Amino acid sequence: MGCTSYAQNFSYPMASPRQVITQQFSVSQITVDYGRPSVRGRKIFGELVPYGKVWRAGANQATSISFLQPVKVGGKSVKKGDYAIFITPEQHQWIIVLNYDADAWGAYSYDPNENAIEFTVPVIQTKDLQESLEFSFESLSNEKLNLIIRWEYTKVEIPIEIDKKEIIDKIIEQLKEVKQFERDLEGKDN
């Protein structure tokens, strides 16, 4: 008589589950991978996440962001690639850092010498409780969008826009020409 184990199909629920969000943007996409801690009755900013200390922008492995084309984040140019997001929260503004160590575990190995860019954004206080940390994309257009971070009663907006607009415009024009060429070929086959 055999015994079959199904345990390999299940995992324990994580206290801070991973979330991956991807947004089609311009001629490519942006992906954010982060751990989603919850408030669970705790005071978050200023206590669990102290003011003035580097935070991994999530739980467990540092939050990462991937760009498949050059962009401007917070008004600063960033090459395509993978970056860790680190934040130094303050009561009225946050310092946002994109760091080259995209595989960092937490903020323990944070090295400011690996920073690609650094900028500040204002903190927006909200009326409604955001129980679990949430990253999202809002105000999307062909040329810009905002990466939103919400947790507890706090929200910040990180502006992202295409870099080197004239190059992207040329790529889009060439793609349109290729599509027209394909349509013309299909018409000749009939």
Predicted features along the sequence, with ranges:
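Mid-length scaffold segments of soluble, non-membrane domains
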Residues: 56-110
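Sec/Tat signal peptide C-region and signal peptidase I cleavage site
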Residues: 3-7
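Primarily secretory-pathway and cell-envelope proteins
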Residues: 8-50, 107-189
